[in-house]
Amino acid sequence: MEKRLQEAQLYKEEGNQRYREGKYRDAVSRYHRALLQLRGLDPSLPSPLPNLGPQGPALTPEQENILHTTQTDCYNNLAACLLQMEPVNYERVREYSQKVLERQPDNAKALYRAGVAFFHLQDYDQARHYLLAAVNRQPKDANVRRYLQLTQSELSSYHRKEKQLYLGMFG
């Protein structure tokens, strides 16, 4: 168990190095490998094969902390990588960012990335929700402010069109 935690951390560090080098596909591969090492160790997730084979020893609180931190970091870093790759898979960015936010609801980077994903998925209400939370945590971040402004603009445009539609129907 300790070996799997260490291997996962090593893969995560390799992923971080690949990210710094701009090798996003390699980084994604390393983060996925890290998560695979952790699969089955997380006591909060149901086992795919319950009561089959010997149960492993329970994780210590320190090991559980390492497990969750490594998982969260990998998901956050996967979302960052995916935003750098063409074409961007915004569904996955959303999914990974929300996994981070399940454990760290105040994670500003995950809030921003979720907002960007929802913006590009054209769910502007959700984008606004996440971007407002991100701007509250990082009020000076120009990227957060820019996406929030773009989202507000799309929402205003949508509401104008909706109003005109209803005026045409009932006017």
Curated annotation (Swiss-Prot):
Top-rank taxon, per record: Eukaryota
Gene3D superfamilies registered for this protein in UniProt: Tetratricopeptide repeat domain
Spans of repeat TPR: 8-41, 72-107, 108-141
A Pfam family matched in the record: TPR_19
Keyword Acetylation belongs to the record: no
Keywords on record: Repeat, TPR repeat
Coiled-coil residue windows: none
InterPro entries: AIP/AIPL1/TTC9, TPR-like_helical_dom_sf, TPR_rpt
SUPFAM superfamilies to which the protein is assigned, alphabetical: TPR-like
Family membership noted in the UniProt record: Belongs to the TTC9 family.
Protein name: Tetratricopeptide repeat protein 9C
Lineage: Eukaryota, Metazoa, Chordata, Craniata, Vertebrata
Annotated gene: TTC9C
